[in-house]
Amino acid sequence: MSTLNALLDRSAQEGGGKTAIVFGDRETSFLALRQEILEIAEGLRRAGVAKGDRVAIVHRNAPEFIIAYFAINRLGAIAVPINFMVQKADELAYMLGDCGAKGVFTQKDFLPGLNGAAAKCPDLRALWVTDAGAEHTALVRPYSELRAAAFPESSADPAVEGDVAAILYTSGTTGFPKGVMLTHRNLVTNCESALKRMNLTRSDVTLCILPMFHSFAWTGIVLTSLRLTLTSVVFSAIAPAKPWLKAMGRRGVSLFAAVPQVYAALVREAKGWKTRAFLRFWAFRRVKIAVSGAAPLSNVVADGFQQALGLAIDQGWGLTETSPVATISAPDAIRLGMVGPPIEGVRVKIVDDLEASLPIGSEGEICVSGDCVMKGYWNRPEDTRAAFTADGWLKTGDIGVLDEDGYLAIRDRKKDMIIVKGLKVFPAQVEAMIAENPAIEESAIIGVPDELGDEVIKAFVVLKKGAVADKSALLQYFKERLDAYKRPRDVEILDALPKNALQKVLKRELRDRELKKRDVAGN
């Protein structure tokens, strides 16, 4: 099974009439899912989409997201899932123009930005809207018009394993986002290798609350569920949580995947005995695997979750460029603070700044090789070359350390590392300490220049509801618990930290805001 098309065909053959997707009151079987995919694929073919063309998806979680993705791939075309939180016309125009998208599957809420972007995208022919209420134009078309006679069953799979299946745009800290090219082989083998580590069976049920445009949700939940013919309970968003928590118990969800911020929120809510009982004896009553990814998970949250719900969190690691899973533990071999050993077909090594391999126990940049590693960046040959070492390993930009058993621990992002008087400070370590303060809900630290141009640490914190703390008290707390070079010299209390759709803190926005404040002060 080397392509996503083959994976889909097998899921329909093995799953048949079993429910593949639960979305609200709507249930779709594996056979019905494939049938609609074939129909939409034929509609796309009639609309002029061919092998190698790019078609974007700007859409919340829904069956139509999955249908669109596989229909695009069915023609040998390339799916381009885009973060639906990007709604500015200029940003959308850059991505749609960069990949040369011929069309976009979307929802009416996102039309203002897409209509604005369309004027700058000469290749864009149609915006197919999946929900009702949109005003149709020559450009804005109803999804239903693509429902054609099914794609001919006799048609050979136009894709081969080395073909690009998807382009995923990563949000860089500077400049424009880069399009990560993932092949059919990348995605299929990554899904299958991760499954071998997870010990799932066909009776398991998954929950998809993470956005499908992100590789964590797509490979870790959607492809996993299709590959094993698991029923997946899908929600359009993480918030509000109550509907999906109730559905977890009702549907018997056994695989739960979320980001650290969701786990932290659950730990906070579980402090009340009624909520803790609801979570432990209803929502999570059948959960056997709880996976965390996309950002570092603090030991405080991991401990709190295990104490409250009796489940150890299985923290995995990877990035968009690795499809995304590179490491994860078997459910019975989880180690606190570790993200597991590499999955089958993946190798990991630690290197220094000169790309020389470091011995076990040494901190350095994590490099990865194997079937999961991207083909490269779309239309960016120089960036692609720069992403790899001289001997062909992907440089991940993460700092980590391997132990003697091959387990990996993540220290931080290389770009987030702060150098204070020549000493390295990893923000994740400092933020973990700050999290121990009972008044603090969450925090983030960044490096800022002092009056002499040296880098010092500034902390941004959000207080818990009803908690009281001022700047001087927080600075004193830091002084008592941190070495001098790791200590924030300034702290700002915010109502909320800027985050993306995965609830990951956007430190670049904090840096940008700080620079603007300093520019204003300088003038």
Q: What kind of feature is each model-predicted range?
A:
Residues 25, 109-161, 268-273:
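ANL superfamily adenylate-forming
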Residues 29-32, 165-189, 329:
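Conserved AMP-binding A3 loop
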